[in-house]
């Protein structure tokens, strides 16, 4: 078990250390705000979407989203851990891919588009995922900071827009992170 030494908070030498971990934590709230602002315009495209039969989330934050949404989501929500998609996924479903790179995310997005599912891709706009997943049933939510928590917040806002999740305020989440 790690014991935290409170005296480190009063040691000027320790406080002067510009540790990348502390700097990263200190800017987390700003990254959430930035990603939410960047994705604001594409999120409006999600207001005219019918309620899906199910939501399948793929990516490193899929289990976090499932933990938040499972108690309140009115449709089945699956955090899919495997390559590919379940055999039943089709045009009545939403596939949410949160990814920066990698052949796994590309394969899942390609399969979702091929099957006619509504695809929501949370990724950098110039990524392979964004380029290869483009279709009329794809909504690209651009993220650029590489922060998985910020990407998860954008995904939560998108699912709220679809009426599948709780009201999500990126500013309130960012303020809570800033308070850490």
Locations of the language-model features?
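Glycine-rich phosphate-binding loops that contact phosphosugars or nucleotide phosphates
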Residues: 48-179
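Extreme N-terminal leader/targeting regions
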Residues: 1-23, 33, 118, 130-146, ...
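N-terminal start-of-chain detector that recognizes signal peptides
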Residues: 3-5, 26-30, 67-70
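A short linear-motif detector with a strong N-terminal bias
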Residues: 10-12, 34-36, 58, 74-77
């Amino acid at each position: 078990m790690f014991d935290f030494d409170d005296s480190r908070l009063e040691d000027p030498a320790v406080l002067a250390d510009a540790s990348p971990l502390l700097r990263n934590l200190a800017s987390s709230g700003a990254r959430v705000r930035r990603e939410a602002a960047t994705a604001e315009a594409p999120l409006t495209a999600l207001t005219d979407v019918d309620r899906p039969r199910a939501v399948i989330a793929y990516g490193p934050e899929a289990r976090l989203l499932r933990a938040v949404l499972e108690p309140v989501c009115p449709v089945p929500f699956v955090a899919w851990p495997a390559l590919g998609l379940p055999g039943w996924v089709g045009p009545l479903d939403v596939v949410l891919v949160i990814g920066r790179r990698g052949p796994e995310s590309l394969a899942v997005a390609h399969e979702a588009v091929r099957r006619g599912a509504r695809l929501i891709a949370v990724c950098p706009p110039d990524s392979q995922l964004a380029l290869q997943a483009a279709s009329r049933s794809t909504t690209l939510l651009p993220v650029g900071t590489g922060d998985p928590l910020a990407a998860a917040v954008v995904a939560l806002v998108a699912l709220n827009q679809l009426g599948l999740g709780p009201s999500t305020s990126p500013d309130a989440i960012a303020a809570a992170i800033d308070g850490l």
